[in-house]
Swiss-Prot record:
InterPro entries linked to this entry: Formyl_transferase-like_C_sf, MPG, MPG_sf
GO biological process: one example: base-excision repair
PANTHER family: DNA-3-METHYLADENINE GLYCOSYLASE (PTHR10429:SF0)
Keyword DNA damage carried by entry: yes
Keywords of the record: DNA damage, DNA repair, Hydrolase
Domain of life according to the entry: Bacteria
GO molecular function, one term: alkylbase DNA N-glycosylase activity
Official protein name in the record: Putative 3-methyladenine DNA glycosylase
Family per record: Belongs to the DNA glycosylase MPG family.
Its EC number(s): 3.2.2.-
Length: 193
């Protein structure tokens, strides 16, 4: 096992820095059947009460979004479109809504477990979207608020250093309702060469 990412890394006040930081890191999730791990290759930054695509827009706290207002270092998992759970890493100090959405992971460990969960899906598509990430890792609403430095979900340094030339920066996906915020280049994809 590599070195776990410390709590300090989750306390950044800059969701863009956070989204870039987690590219190339190793996400691991443990259940009673073992551990599934993989390298994060796609993220999106969400942050601050002014971000119309962020669940904390306008500092409105609801039962659904209250996790994003907590101190960084926990998982924010929610159900989207009545179909998918999505995994976010909460960032920053308590009271400021910031998170990084985990959009894509290359599975490196626990492949047999993922093969069971993703029957009939080619390996290259197991976790190449945010809903696919949670299905592959077995993440659901019971993981909302779980520590990211604990024994259920954690992130490690992988030893990978990504050249800036391999990071594609685009607008976020699925947030057309957010006006000018929909066009901001807050999605980051590692285009592995």
């Amino acid at each position: 096992m590599g070195e776990k990412i410390s709590l300090d890394a989750y306390l950044t006040n800059n969701p863009i820095e956070g989204a870039l930081f987690f590219l190339g890191k190793k996400l691991s999730v443990k259940d009673d059947k073992g551990v599934v791990s993989g390298i994060i290759f796609e993220t999106e930054a969400y942050g601050g009460a002014e971000d119309r695509a962020c669940h904390g827009y306008g500092n409105r706290v609801t039962p659904r979004n209250k996790t994003i207002f907590q101190r960084g270092g926990i998982a924010y998992v929610y159900f989207c479109y009545g179909m998918h759970y999505l995994l976010n890493f909460v960032l920053g100090p308590e009271g400021i809504p910031m998170a990084v959405l985990i959009r894509g992971v290359w599975i490196t460990e626990g492949k047999e477990r993922v093969r069971e969960r993703r029957k009939g899906i080619p390996e290259k598509h197991w976790a190449d979207g945010p809903g696919k990430v949670t299905r592959s890792f077995g993440i659901n609403d019971s993981d909302n608020g779980v520590s990211l430095i604990g024994d259920r979900i954690w992130v490690e340094y992988s030893g990978i250093v990504i050249p800036e030339t391999e990071i594609k920066n685009t607008a976020r996906i699925g947030v057309d309702y957010a006006g000018e915020w929909a066009k901001k280049p807050l999605r980051f994809v590692w285009e592995k060469k």
